[in-house]
């Protein structure tokens, strides 16, 4: 695949129009707004930075790197182990349901784009979008760092768009938040990808509480 086609595939994977339901989950933000933990754009920036530093950098990205390398080796056993580890790190039923829902949606895309995708890999994709994205990146020969940039941007944009609806704040503030959060992401991405096994794990108890409480929140915009 040419460099131009790789870049275009990368932009497609980062697109907000990708039908995986990324804008239907708030990851606890809706309850955090309801209870008053997040009242404005400044509070949101603090909240999302915590999720980035203590969850995405310590769980999602390092496990994504391991999944990518497992796909390079065609090592289904290793990919299965890390997919299960990722799911175990999702601390609430809602977060695990989001992981599986996004995974199932992404699996449909992978099968449509790559009809000869091996049957042995498909159940792993259905458990986690990260596994499907890693496999597709290897198939399309997209470097891990480029794929990680796409993954991070998509995650941050989805979070900010949830904030626009819930906090709320305007589109100009949203773009400024995306800009600053992306700068923070770029600074920490390489270290997160190289994180050793002994340092894997999240530390976001408030986010876990918010997600658990959101499951029974009386009035909500986002799925649970």
From Swiss-Prot:
<dbReference type="InterPro" id="IPR038277">
    <property type="entry name" value="UreF_sf"/>
</dbReference>
<comment type="subunit">
    <text>UreD, UreF and UreG form a complex that acts as a GTP-hydrolysis-dependent molecular chaperone, activating the urease apoprotein by helping to assemble the nickel containing metallocenter of UreC. The UreE protein probably delivers the nickel.</text>
</comment>
<keyword id="KW-0963">Cytoplasm</keyword>
<keyword id="KW-0143">Chaperone</keyword>
<dbReference type="InterPro" id="IPR002639">
    <property type="entry name" value="UreF"/>
</dbReference>
<dbReference type="GO" id="GO:0016151">
    <property type="term" value="F:nickel cation binding"/>
</dbReference>
<keyword id="KW-0996">Nickel insertion</keyword>
<comment type="similarity">
    <text>Belongs to the UreF family.</text>
</comment>
<dbReference type="Pfam" id="PF01730">
    <property type="entry name" value="UreF"/>
</dbReference>
<comment type="function">
    <text>Required for maturation of urease via the functional incorporation of the urease nickel metallocenter.</text>
</comment>
<dbReference type="GO" id="GO:0005737">
    <property type="term" value="C:cytoplasm"/>
</dbReference>
<protein>
    <recommendedName>
        <fullName>Urease accessory protein UreF</fullName>
    </recommendedName>
</protein>
């Amino acid at each position: 695949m040419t460099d131009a086609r790789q870049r275009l595939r990368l932009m497609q994977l980062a697109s907000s129009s990708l039908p995986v339901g990324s804008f239907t989950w708030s990851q606890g933000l809706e309850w955090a707004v309801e209870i008053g933990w997040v009242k404005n754009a400044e509070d949101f920036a603090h909240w999302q930075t915590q999720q980035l530093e203590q969850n995405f950098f310590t769980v999602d990205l390092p496990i994504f790197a391991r999944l990518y390398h497992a796909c390079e080796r065609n090592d289904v056993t290793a990919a299965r182990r890390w997919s299960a580890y990722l799911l175990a790190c999702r601390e609430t039923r809602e977060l695990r349901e989001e992981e599986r829902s996004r995974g199932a949606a992404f699996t449909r895309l992978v099968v449509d784009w790559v009809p000869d995708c091996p049957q042995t890999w498909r159940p792993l994709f259905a458990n986690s979008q990260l596994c499907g994205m890693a496999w597709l990146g290897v198939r399309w020969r997209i470097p891990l760092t480029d794929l990680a940039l796409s993954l991070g941007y998509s995650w941050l944009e989805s979070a900010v768009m949830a904030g626009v609806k819930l906090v709320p704040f305007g589109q100009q503030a949203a773009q400024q938040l995306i800009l600053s959060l992306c700068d923070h992401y770029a600074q920490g991405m390489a270290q997160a990808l190289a994180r050793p096994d002994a340092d894997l794990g999240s530390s976001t108890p408030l986010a876990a509480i918010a997600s658990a409480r959101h499951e029974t929140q009386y009035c909500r915009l986002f799925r649970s």
